[in-house]
Amino acid sequence: MLKKLLKMNLFLIIILFFTSAITTAKESPSDEDIDRARKMVKLLDDLYKTFIELITEEYVKNPALLPAATLSKRVFEVMEEKGWHKARLLDATGTPFNPDNNPKDAFERDAINAFAWGNSYIERVENIEGKDYLRAATSLTAVTEGCTICHPGKKVGDLLGAISYTIPLQE
């Protein structure tokens, strides 16, 4: 009788273990989560590129000001410190002013390669340290003559780099 009871308890423990493992297993991000992150990237990209263009216009008038790349990187750092998202400037010229702007992983290298072939957007969902993120990148081109002050040898329309975004998919 005791053996039968122990076997039954062991059986129940095993069932509970597997049931628990199944119910706590991490689900894939939903389409809604991915769509929300895409919209966030679109909004951030518009905001950051507008910021870069406006700062560049002011820098042209007063070169004593900090350049757009320096200010953008600082804004990106503050947003990450506040826990919102991660954004990085990436170099696509092969000769970055700052080596920190070189692509750091496969996604960023793939983005720069895609932009060199004429694409302007790339994305993928990645699991980083157990959490799902939308990784997205958008191309940065010289949009005004002012861009050529810091990017000599480039002209309006030339690819300069990218902004890489890492947006969490679950709250």
Where are these regions (language model features)?
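The canonical Cys-X-X-Cys-His
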Residues: V143-K154
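Bacterial N-terminal signal peptides that target proteins for export
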Residues: M1-F11
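Extracytoplasmic c-type cytochrome modules immediately beyond a signal peptide or single-pass transmembrane anchor
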Residues: T23-V143, G157-E171
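A general structural signal for short secondary-structure junctions and capping/turn motifs
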Residues: K4, K155-V156
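A broad helix-preferring feature
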Residues: L2, T19-I22
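Bacterial N-terminal signal peptides
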Residues: N9-T19
